[in-house]
Amino acid sequence: MLSCASVLQCGSPCLFREQSKAVRRTALHDAGAKLMFALFFMATTGLAERHEFSRPLMGMAFRIIVHSENEAKTKRAVKAAFDRVAVLNQIMSDYEPESELNKLSNLAGSGKVAKISDELCRVLDRAQALAVETGGAFDVTAGASIQLWRRARRVKRLPPQYVLAKALKTVGFRGLKLDAKNCTAELTKPGTRLDLGGIAKGHALDEALAVLKKHGLLQALVSAGGDIVAGAAPPGKKGW
């Protein structure tokens, strides 16, 4: 610290240098205080990091992105979300021979009324509502014809017209008699095959996101086959 006499001797440039040093000391002190606060905040609240996971489910890759500060908690939640999708696949897949959906399709035309799970009942109820709204453009009873076109794509040859005509006779959403209150269903037309490809994936995405939210992971995004559902935006962003 300079004396008044020293200041008078060195003149105003000396005084300016001393003032600049004081300003720098104050700035460094403030910066240090802010850094200490930031370190304390991070230590006590954690820092949300981006985590990405992927698992093959429903014949495609299901991808989950979450922002979380707890890695162990995140892994538990993501596993639960993937497990939920796996359960839904066992219910609604038309590829799995022992799925609940295929077991119902196997009863088509038998006159038997099947008791179905609440899960399948809920999805079929929504599918039937969409069929009515679209005048039959959306129809989950089109499985037999869809299988023909899948095969045509594999072998690169169109199905014969008579085979296609036979499959089309099995299609018609009114041939699915659903009692949504008691969760029973009957397929009245022989040969009808159910295909939930237009609705099952979206339902699975919604359910996976719900599981993540239940575990406290609100900043999450789930995607599969081009479809996406999203929760809260990542930290510091307005959206995904």
Task: Report residues per predicted region.
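Cationic, low-complexity basic patches in intrinsically disordered or flexible, solvent-exposed regions
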Residues: 10, 19-20, 35
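Basic polycationic patches enriched in arginine
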Residues: 17, 24-25
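Short linear motifs centered on Gly/Pro in flexible linkers and helix caps
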Residues: 25-26, 223
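Mature catalytic core of soluble alpha/beta enzymes
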Residues: 37, 43-240
